[in-house]
Amino acid sequence: MTSLTCGAAVITFNGMKHLPQQLDSIATQTRAVQHIVISDDNSTDGTWEYLENWAKHASIRVTLVRNQPQLGLIANFEQAVSMVEADIVFSSDQDDVWLPNKVELVAAVFERHPDVQLVHTDADLIDGSGRELGTTLLTELMVSDRERIAVREGKAYEVYFRRNLVTGAAAAFRKNILDLARPIPNVLYHDAWLAFMASAVGKVHLLDVPTIQYRVHGSNMVGVEIGKRKQNMLEKARSFYWALNGKNELAKNINHALSRRTVLYERLSSHPELSPHYKAMASEALQFAQRRQALVSTPRNPVGRTIAVLRNAVRGHYRKYSAAPWSESLRDILNR
């Protein structure tokens, strides 16, 4: 079994509150990373000065980069992962904590399965003070057995067309998928984009155990809505009522989906070596988003909308490309 080199890409911005604990957790892994790239987006709270001192004493090779002016989240991430010199790249937020055997567990999956391009894992959720919240990332995302089976059977892309399950802080990928993934578009989160790219060229593996403590607080770049799965029927009905009466929000969401699916289809279409089936799904998903956009852009016509929605439903498009098929189809019919 081939031994792979591992590296970490850490992006920072004004992260002094939690950064020392995160860096210590990376540096004390049971299986060491060979290279750490830390790309700082022009912090002003002492983060950069701390990084310079930390790098001088680190036992691991460290590359520091300071962006002046700022690049923003996605461009900073792309810069960091591109600079890592390793077979496997572990992406890292500045405020989480790696469990001691994270690299060991994840690297073993890549070494056992050469066709796996990306591994993502569960995470224990903690609050801003580091207290455990008694739940995990996949639990709060309400990942179903059906979704787990699809990923395990090499059909992760069928899941990702409906919704993203990959959180970058709990993921690692083979660096060579950056050949397809770059440049990373700014119309969707980089972890969702990498999940699509990985599933286009190989398999994705869901490691159903926590490998990090994921910090949930008000400053999260990408947060988790704790407790959503515990809503009672009245709360769900109230949420659905407001969704039905939010035409502008619905149009915004559909336009966003259209932008995401456009860039995905264009990227896949520019690579003839990729699976025709995957490209066909990307094309179908794009056409579905285009039809939904046209639907909500026209004056409300319950009969016409119902016919259009039923046509999409019969084709299986809501089931294949919507995270909540029933509620989204009803919104398309009833939204004012």
Regions found by a protein language model. Name each.
Residues 1-231, 330:
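Nucleotide-sugar donor-binding/catalytic module of glycosyltransferases
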Residues 160-161, 186-188, 192, 204, ...:
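C-terminal subregions of glycosyltransferases and related glycan-biosynthesis enzymes
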